[in-house]
Amino acid sequence: MFRETIENEYIVIQEGTSEGTQMKYRKGDYWYKKDCRGKEGLVEYLVSEMLKYSTLDLAEYVVYEYGYINEARGCRSKNFLEAGEELITFYRLYYNEFGKDLSQILALMETMEERIEYVIKFVWQSCGLDITEYLKKVFTLDMLILNEDRHLNNLAVVLRGNRFVSAPIFDNGMSLLTANQSVNWHFPVEENVKRVVARPFCGSHEKMFHYFGQGFCVDFAAVQQWIEEEEDTNEKKVLKYQLQRYSFLATESI
């Protein structure tokens, strides 16, 4: 766990479509985010630690540390961009090309399938990159962790020289019910998880998962051993429940 004092000169203002308003800093080779609506930093840490026991490569997701920023809870992650690389979100990619808000365009479409196919086609035509496998991994994770804030500014590509590649999966803090205001912790977890609404293509994580299929596996035994060592929190309780709920994502050994 880290403790960092950061002056206001390191505050970075980012525009986007996220409902979150976390204070973000860039200092040295690290990004820092303060908690805002829940224990987002803890969630980022738990999710990235869990993914270490998955079939995803380390380069396919961002690793977060949990700690304190100016004595407030939060997290930090290393900058994943190499020199000369640029992160371009789906939102900005579309706006740069058409001058329109992609989320508003998708809202006009009637079905999840239309929205997904439109975005995949657009990114292919703009970047020459098929993002199907990337989205498959993202929505497998989002279903598992109940991500309530996947949007067009945390789905992204990276411009690397003269070609585009999928960005690593990042920004998972609004998950594990940490900031869901409708949750009642006097109720069982299985009741509270019903209060989750997914994004961005439809309100159901499972529908998006079934559209794409399974994106990765998790070493269930290793995760269970690790998670028991973590501090008892509601977020940990939800993650344990979700791992049991979607135990078909497990693999015996990685």
What are these regions (language model features)?
Residues 38, 47-48, 59, 103-109, ...:
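A broadly tuned "polar low-complexity/structure-edge" signature
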Residues 1-102:
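Conserved ATP-binding subdomain of kinase catalytic cores across diverse folds
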Residues 80-139, 203, 215, 231, ...:
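ATP-dependent phospho-/nucleotidyl transfer catalytic cores
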Residues 112-176:
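Conserved kinase catalytic-core segment
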Residues 1, 129-131, 253-254:
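Intrinsic structural disorder
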Residues 61-64, 107-110, 197-203:
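Short C-terminal domain-edge/linker segments immediately following a structured domain
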Residues 35-39, 162-254:
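C-terminal catalytic region of ATP-dependent kinase domains
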